[in-house]
Amino acid sequence: MKIVVYHAEECDRKKCTSLKLGRKGKFKIVSSLNQLPRGALVLNPFSEKAVSPEDRDMVLRRGIAALDCSWKKVKKSSVIFQTARNHRSLPFLVAANPTNYGKPCILSTAEAVAATLYIVGLKDIASDIMSYFKWGPHFLDLNRELLEAYSRAENSLEVVEIQKKFIGG
Ligand SMILES: C[S@@+](CC[C@H](N)C(=O)[O-])C[C@H]1O[C@@H](n2cnc3c(N)ncnc32)[C@H](O)[C@@H]1O
């Protein structure tokens, strides 16, 4: 499984989830956009299209790419979000990492990648990624009902419908 993270060097390196997974050999950390895998699913919080089980083949064959930068600095115009295709945002999920605990959609890179893997049906790999953090398994437990529902959707539109019903109560 190719998981490649473009690292913008804006974070506290001790707290950075992608650098930790890079050290464990789970993520490849790159500093040049040319090193991102072609055709990968790009995790972009500004994308209008949501991750769905339809993306499974793309994830298996091409991998996942993410941008690790400060949430304070991330912008629609961030360079990685301009260059690649196949951008996806994650539907409503709540962060469990200590920096943004309880905040919807403001996920760490590790949480975003694990959620993507879960939704496309690669649940064991999602659990493995989360197992490197004390709070990681809690992220999956906290969001289990929604992650399960998203993982049973047909496509991105259905994922958005599930999200709407959940937020609307
Ligand atoms: C802004 S960085 C923050 C990383 C943080 N410093 C850490 O240690 O994990 C998080 C990245 O994860 C992905 N991500 C997080 N939440 C997302 C969402 N709701 N939709 C799509 N991608 C998301 C994006 O690639 C985003 O740039």
Curated annotation (Swiss-Prot):
One of its GO terms (molecular function) is 18S rRNA aminocarboxypropyltransferase activity. One of its GO terms (biological process) is enzyme-directed rRNA pseudouridine synthesis. Keywords: Cytoplasm, Ribosome biogenesis, rRNA processing, S-adenosyl-L-methionine, Transferase. Coiled coil: none annotated. It is an enzyme of class 2 (transferase). It is found in: Cytoplasm. It catalyses: an N(1)-methylpseudouridine in rRNA + S-adenosyl-L-methionine = N(1)-methyl-N(3)-[(3S)-3-amino-3-carboxypropyl]pseudouridine in rRNA + S-methyl-5'-thioadenosine + H(+). Its main location: cytoplasm. InterPro entries: Tsr3-like, Tsr3_C. PANTHER family: 18S RRNA AMINOCARBOXYPROPYLTRANSFERASE, RIBOSOME BIOGENESIS PROTEIN TSR3 HOMOLOG. HAMAP family: TSR3. This is 16S rRNA aminocarboxypropyltransferase. The lineage of its organism: Archaea, Methanobacteriati, Methanobacteriota, Methanomada group, Methanobacteria.
